UniProtKB/Swiss-Prot annotation:
GO terms for biological process: regulation of DNA-templated transcription. Gene3D superfamilies: Helix-loop-helix DNA-binding domain. This is Transcription factor bHLH99. Keywords: DNA-binding, Nucleus, Transcription, Transcription regulation. The lineage of its organism: Eukaryota, Viridiplantae, Streptophyta, Embryophyta, Tracheophyta. Induction: Repressed by heat treatment. The gene is BHLH99. Expressed constitutively in roots, stems, and flowers. The keyword Cytoplasm does not apply.
Amino acid sequence: MMFQQDYPHGFSLVETSLSYEMLDYFQNIVVSNSEDVASQQNSISSSSYSSATLSCSITEQKSHLTEKLSPLRERYGCGDFLSRKRRRRSEKTIVDKENQRMNHIAVERNRRKQMNHFLSILKSMMPLSYSQPNDQASIIEGTISYLKKLEQRLQSLEAQLKATKLNQSPNIFSDFFMFPQYSTATATATATASSSSSSHHHHKRLEVVADVEVTMVERHANIKVLTKTQPRLLFKIINEFNSLGLSTLHLNLTTSKDMSLFTFSVKVEADCQLTPSGNEVANTVHEVVRRVHKER
């Protein structure tokens, strides 16, 4: 197996071997002709040839040398070696340029195909009022306009949400109520009334002004009231409790912003006008708070 190796001046192994063979051939020709010239010079010096005869002899030697070199040129083409090498380089350059041109055309074709695909998807996502024309510039212009409109809408919604959060104060007292009889969160009040002849339940849809939870243990009641802060609200509630026969044993007040949480520990006296039940006391407490708010 013949391996291709790098030789000086860009020649291959085959070309180098041919060159060596040609050099040997040239050397033999030159040596033989040198001997002929030397013999002729000796004969000239001895025979005193004229200069015209010497010139004719040199011409004949050149012609003879050319005739000997002709078969070698026909066999190896040594005269056209450099021209063939240049031609191969030129042909290689032309092929490389053609390949680059074809690659560039293929890349450009794929790029346009992808661009058209993306534009069709973009157009399908736009409203009809923004995607009427079919040219690429109009589709991109409509998309930009639509995105600007969405951005303005988003900023407006964010401003509304921020204003809503500022207006709505978080109810930090929501965990204080387990089973309230009245709750502003549901805005539903359940009132239980008892008559002297029989007991039955009445569900009324009332205006809930406070969260009220009442827990009864015999004749002692734990009352929690969460409502909007109002001047002299605590004083008015205590006076109403006393008039109903509810003695205040302990109380606690906690405020946060515009809300107040009242915690009462009361005793239902014997002369109390209310039935000692959680629902009855809750109804009365809520009615007291609602009446106090109306007196403002």
